[in-house]
Amino acid sequence: MNKAISDFTAHTPMMQQYWKLKNQHPDQLMFYRMGDFYEIFYEDAKKAAKLLDITLTARGQSAGQSIPMCGIPFHSLEGYLAKLVKLGESVVICEQIGDPATSKGPVERQVVRIITPGTVSDEALLDERRDNLIAALLGDERLFGLAVLDITSGNFSVQEIKGWENLLAELERLNPVELLIPDDWPRDLPAEKRPGARRRAPWDFDRDSARKALCQQFATKDLKGFGCDKLTLAIGAAGCLLTYAKETQRTALPHLRSLRHERLDDTVILDGASRRNLELDINLAGGRDNTLQSVIDRCQTAMASRLLSRWLNRPLRDLKVLQARQDSIRCLLDSYRFEKLQPQLKEIGDIERILARIGLRNARPRDLARLRDALGALPELQNAMTELEAPHLARLAAITGTYPELASLLERAIIDNPPAVIRDGGVLKAGYDNELDDLLAISENAGQFLIDLEAREKARTGLANLKVGYNRVHGYFIELPTKQAEQAPGDYIRRQTLKGAERFITPELKAFEDKALSAKSRALAREKMLYDALLETLISHLAPLQDSAAALAELDVLSNLAERALNLDLNCPRFVDEPCLRIVQGRHPVVEQVLTTPFVANDLGLDNSTRMLIITGPNMGGKSTYMRQTALIVLLAHIGSFVPAASCELSLVDRIFTRIGSSDDLAGGRSTFMVEMSETANILHNATDRSLVLMDEVGRGTSTFDGLSLAWAAAERLAQLRAYTLFATHYFELTVLPESEPLVANVHLNATEHNERIVFLHHVLPGPASQSYGLAVAQLAGVPTVVIQRAREHLGRLETTSLPHEQPPAAKAKDAPQVPHQSDLFASLPHPAIEKLGKLQLDDMTPRQAIEMLYQLKNLL
């Protein structure tokens, strides 16, 4: 970016003006209005030319040096801004506010708006289906205050979070496009590594100033009513956001009306790894296809899609809210009521963001036309909602309301299909304002006046070739061929000489010209004034309109979930007090949609008698799908949705952990195994007896002995924590865990071989798998036949030279699947019975206790 300079004297007057403005925004690209172009100078020009793929040139000299520059036409601004914002750049728009005709020296200019990725509101610069968030942080490693603002909706929230781990998980959930941190924080903190991190002056986070600014914004005496009066760190962060928003928007922010206190205790917590692995709204490749939201989002409005995304990324533990949503979905399914509502909801559009632009006073004519259509659709929607008896839906209907006066005002004011901008007029209907109509009539009647004048002048002069016309440079004129110019009457005043013709003007035509051109500029000014007044009228009704938009978005989400329940065969889960997770015929909602063959549904049962399932079976057998579908079913239940299962009974969970698949973190300098162990450590430190834990192939990133040892110890620890755990592994040694851990059970995904080909059956059955089918999977993947044959030779030799694996009691039973013979990697470890025997305090035992212990030891053999 351009470095600030303090000495302007060597520069031309215009460049002095430029530098005075640029010094206030050294880190942002400045678009400097000059006539019909926005010009960009110096280092800004070099950067912009590269990013926008436009020509870099030079303009004259200033301070003895040529000025690098590039430029864009003013009417093409939005397209270039969209590209820069997507690249994470911020842009300062500097407009001419003085009159070039009357200015002495450079035309007066000032910064009118600042566009940053987190504060854009223009429709063209936003992703309509995703929140555009900006966040601010204050605190230290022990406690952080986090404030989050969506300027395009007015949603403003605060919370305080303990420790980096929880903070980074929350930032992963929110994914803000900008993150403001104090400039006096140490460098290279984890938060600063996020894209969009920006440092701000420490005084922007001053807590006392923040409290005053927030109270002034919300017109309250204090912040107690928002439940955040004691969150001093979060208040400091919120004050920084408010300052930043006002600085960039250069206007009041009436659509920011309240502050919401969010609490982690109210939600099901997912860390960053779990969120990525479950592919809630972004797949592992960074796209949106084949995600949970891509399957369950058929919302009619963009604002509802954004709300659904928030629900998916912030599942709740509030049973009252969840049951209200379930009741609403049942009601909407009854007699297929959602089918009547959805077409009407589609007419509403994205009024949430339209209202925000109205609050920011930058709403465009088409925004008002869409709001007019939405308000016009409300009465019919309200009539349909009167049939909905669910209490929560009745509340939404009451909040939605109707606005007949505003609908009538917009109907009278805005033409049916207005232009994109107010700049050139043509937005307001005839009859809306008499003075505007009179001014427009003068311009519109100019054509007839010229026809009449031409006829009169031909008759008066007898010159048949006389013409009356107009051009933008010279205005109105009477044109005569050169040969007839000498016959012009004495009141004809020569205006322009052309090849073969002369142009004149008369006092009458000059008077009309002054009136017509004045009327046009006055009409544009009058229409802009009326348009601004219309925005102010709408702003005075902003609070109830925003409440209505929020209610309509929720109604749209609930109607969508009802439609999905019907068409995806989803059923209502039942929350119970007893700690359990019981799923009958559960399915993976995304995989089911992409398969060309029927999905194989499976059961799952976890309760006080079984808290962990050791899952074995071949690769591609369905272990990961089985685990992920369990997590998605639990997550959907915790947003109030129906779930892909014949039935589901569960208690509230506090967290969902997934350790499924890993890759190198090259930027962070961490290997695959290091990433895997970091995720495992997070789970072991934070899982509780109310957590759902998915562990897939723990320990595979290191040597066999180390990996198996870590997997075994991690499984034991999770069993002791009593977390609901699905533990998939290829270490068959772990299938003996149920012998020493009574809350652990074995299940496996079955498969069979036919003509040396593997067939995956995808059924989950009790007990450990009978074999791994590793060579069959390798053959299926296309490994050369010669390699497969050689592998079979090695396998045979290994199996004959290795000790047979000790079979667990369940595996010895008749018809039970046999654990394959393979090296017992823990052959040198003491038997569980010997371990237990070594810990006994024999002198402290009674004879009866000794006999009971003897029986326990016998059962371990």
Swiss-Prot record:
Q: Which Pfam families match?
A: MutS_I (PF01624), MutS_II (PF05188), MutS_III (PF05192), MutS_IV (PF05190), MutS_V (PF00488)
UniProt lists the family membership as follows:
Belongs to the DNA mismatch repair MutS family.
Q: Which UniProt keywords apply?
A: ATP-binding, DNA damage, DNA repair, DNA-binding, Nucleotide-binding
Some GO term, biological process aspect, for this entry: which one? mismatch repair
Q: What is this protein called?
A: DNA mismatch repair protein MutS
The keyword ATP-binding belongs to this UniProt entry's keyword annotation:
yes
Q: Which GO terms describe its cellular component?
A: cytosol
Q: What SUPFAM superfamilies does the record point to?
A: DNA repair protein MutS, domain I, DNA repair protein MutS, domain II, DNA repair protein MutS, domain III, P-loop containing nucleoside triphosphate hydrolases
- Biased composition, class Low complexity, residue ranges: 808-820
Q: What is the role of this chain?
A: This protein is involved in the repair of mismatches in DNA. It is possible that it carries out the mismatch recognition step. This protein has a weak ATPase activity.
Q: Provide the GO MF annotations for this entry.
A: ATP binding; ATP-dependent DNA damage sensor activity; damaged DNA binding; mismatched DNA binding
Residues annotated as binding ATP are 617-624
Which residue ranges are recorded for the region named Disordered?
Answer: 799-822
Record Gene3D superfamilies? 1.10.1420.10, 6.10.140.430, DNA repair protein MutS, domain I, MutS, connector domain, P-loop containing nucleotide triphosphate hydrolases
Q: Establish whether keyword DNA-binding is in the entry.
A: yes
The record's section on InterPro entries has: DNA_mismatch_repair_MutS, DNA_mismatch_repair_MutS-lik_N, DNA_mismatch_repair_MutS/MSH, DNA_mismatch_repair_MutS_C, DNA_mismatch_repair_MutS_clamp, DNA_mismatch_repair_MutS_core, DNA_mismatch_repair_MutS_N, DNA_mismatch_repair_MutS_sf
Q: Which PANTHER family match?
A: DNA MISMATCH REPAIR PROTEIN MSH1, MITOCHONDRIAL, DNA MISMATCH REPAIR PROTEIN MUTS FAMILY MEMBER
